[in-house]
Amino acid sequence: MKKLIIPFIFISFIWPQDFEPTNMSPIVAYWKTLTPAQKETYLFSYMTQTYETYEELKNELGHTDLTKWYYDNRAELVFGIFDQFKDKDLDEFVGWIDEYYSHEEFVNQPFYEAMAFAFRFQQAAGETIWEK
């Protein structure tokens, strides 16, 4: 009996206990490899691209349902963040995005969701997530 239990215990330590793999978004994997300065550049580039896409939609299509959807679901948040730049630094937004992606349940969420999280917490009073 003892000979049967020892291999079983040994195998249970070798075999991984968590069979559910984490599906990390490629954007999150890329984000985690960047330095803080590179993250600021990436965030600003993402926001600039969103702004330019919205402007192109307005110029090419006018104020259609697609343009309205893009504004409501993507551009409005970016415009709100741009408005915050006169009071807040870009590195504060980067810090909140890092905080968002530090939680395992959010690593498969799109970058837009992390920006929304950063924007909400940036506006709240307090210095840490517990104070907010």
State what each model feature region is.
Residues K2-K3, K39:
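Basic side chains
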Residues F19-P26, T53-K132:
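Compact alpha-helical subdomains of small soluble proteins
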Residues K3-P16:
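Sec-dependent N-terminal signal peptides
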Residues Q17-F44:
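Immediate post-signal-peptide N-terminus of mature secreted/exported proteins
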